[in-house]
Amino acid sequence: IHYSQNLWTWCANNKVAFFYASSAATYGDGEHGYDDVSIDNLRPLNGYGYSKHFFDQWALRQVAENKPMPSAWAGFKFFNVYGPNEYHKERMASVAFHSFNQFKETGTVKLFKSHKEGFDDGMQLRDFVYVKDAAAAVVHFLTAALSGKPCSNGLYNIGTGKARAFKDLATN
């Protein structure tokens, strides 16, 4: 997170806007909801989520302590972004991408096994957001900042607001 902190500090010192990719992974299993009102209660499930979470906490501390801030700033908590041309991501490509290719090759989609009581295989929920919709949200913030009328600073969820089961994705 040190590089991100250095970028923030440079932007603050030079009155430049700072927009960064956080992640919905900061919410962990969703037990504490999907907002940042109680950010210190969030428990990411992996190192990636924690790295994003630590920087989000650090940014909010800068604000709370009235430290220098960029001219405008936002952390975008992207949910499950999918879209064309994900080939270069290999195994890190979206579930939607892998499911589509699996269906194209075999005519079926193998659903994730559930390891949680009460969830059948494939019934795990995710908020799938198309890459062009995610990009439009970021462009909105950039355009507002460039126009001199930036949006409110803070952390923003970038998703549809509706979770879908993997099974639903695979059958529709």
Tell where the protein language model's regions lie, with residue ranges.
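Residue(s) in the substrate-gating loop at a strand-loop-helix junction
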Residues: 23
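Catalytic helix-loop patch of NAD(P)-dependent Rossmann-fold dehydrogenases
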Residues: 2-6, 13, 17, 26-75, ...
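Mid/C-terminal beta-alpha module of Rossmann-like enzyme folds, strongest
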Residues: 140, 144-172
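Residue-level detector of conserved, well-ordered beta-strand and adjacent loop positions
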Residues: 35, 112, 159
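Pocket-edge positions in alpha/beta enzyme catalytic cores
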Residues: 43, 123-126, 161
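NAD(P)-dependent short-chain dehydrogenase/reductase
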Residues: 57-140
